[in-house]
């Protein structure tokens, strides 16, 4: 139950620390996060804050969205997301507030969630890291097949969850405990160590890590 930010993956680069060591980082644009609604147990049955991010053209906003954003007094965004919060933290926020990247600090660990890159229909070698069979010496047309996928007449079926070929990627993925390397409050940029899920320009959600000290 922590507050986070929604940002845009700009790309990867590297920075140098005080010892001159090259550190690979992902640049995240965390600008324009606005509170659109504060939900309480009295009115909604649970406590959470609703946030919008980015911008949307006026001709792309329907009447329901326009009314919702106008009530909050914020510019229309690309989407809405909720963060579950305690009543104490919820009391510090109100509709129309802007949440900035300053909520993070250098050295802090964060969890980043995004939609992984889609790889299309992939076989078991690529999708599940299966080993390939021999390329020659008696092997014919079975170089990349997964092998047996079931049993005999009993049970006479393939068990659910069997690792097989299929859609690979394009799913929600989270990378945990990434270190914040730099916080650029002026340009609302966040630099985190390592790679994060998703393609360039895709949306990501950044939250304080839930496994700090673990």
From Swiss-Prot:
Q: Which Gene3D superfamilies match?
A: 3.30.160.810, Translation factors
The cellular component terms of Gene Ontology attached to this UniProt record, alphabetical and capped at eight, are: cytosolic large ribosomal subunit
Q: Which protein are we looking at?
A: Large ribosomal subunit protein uL3
Q: Is the keyword Translocase assigned to this protein? A: no
**What family is this?**
Belongs to the universal ribosomal protein uL3 family.
Query: Source taxonomy lineage?
Result: Bacteria, Pseudomonadati, Pseudomonadota, Betaproteobacteria, Neisseriales
Posttranslational modification: Methylated by PrmB.
Q: Which UniProt keywords apply?
A: Methylation, Ribonucleoprotein, Ribosomal protein, RNA-binding, rRNA-binding
Modified positions (N5-methylglutamine) are: 153
Q: Does the keyword Ribosomal protein apply?
A: yes
- Region annotated Disordered sits at 131-155
Biological process (GO) annotations held by this record are: translation
Task: Write down the InterPro entries for this protein, in alphabetical order.
Answer: Ribosomal_uL3, Ribosomal_uL3_bac/org-type, Ribosomal_uL3_CS, Transl_B-barrel_sf
Its annotated function is as follows:
One of the primary rRNA binding proteins, it binds directly near the 3'-end of the 23S rRNA, where it nucleates assembly of the 50S subunit.
User: Gene encoding this chain?
Assistant: rplC
Question: What is the protein's quaternary organization?
Answer: Part of the 50S ribosomal subunit. Forms a cluster with proteins L14 and L19.
Any one GO MF annotation of this record: structural constituent of ribosome
One Pfam family named in its UniProt record: Ribosomal_L3
């Amino acid at each position: 139950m922590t507050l986070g930010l929604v940002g845009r993956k700009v790309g990867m680069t590297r920075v140098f620390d005080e010892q001159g060591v090259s550190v690979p980082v992902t640049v995240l644009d965390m600008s324009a996060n606005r509170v659109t609604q504060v939900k309480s147990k009295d009115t909604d049955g649970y406590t959470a804050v609703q946030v919008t991010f980015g911008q949307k053209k006026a001709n792309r906003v329907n009447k329901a969205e326009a009314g919702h954003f106008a009530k909050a007094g914020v510019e229309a965004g690309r989407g809405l997301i909720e963060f579950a919060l305690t009543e104490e933290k919820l009391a510090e926020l109100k509709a129309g507030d802007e949440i900035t990247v300053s909520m993070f600090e250098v050295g802090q660990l964060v969890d980043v969630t995004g939609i992984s890159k889609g790889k299309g229909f992939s076989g078991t070698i690529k999708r599940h890291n299966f080993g390939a069979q021999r390329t020659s010496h008696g092997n014919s047309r079975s170089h990349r097949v997964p092998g047996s996928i079931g049993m005999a007449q009993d049970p006479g079926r393939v068990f659910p969850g069997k690792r097989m070929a299929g859609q690979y990627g394009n799913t929600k993925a989270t990378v945990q405990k990434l270190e914040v390397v730099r916080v650029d409050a002026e340009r609302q940029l966040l630099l985190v160590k390592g790679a994060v899920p998703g393609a360039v320009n895709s949306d990501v959600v950044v939250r304080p890590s839930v496994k700090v000290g673990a």
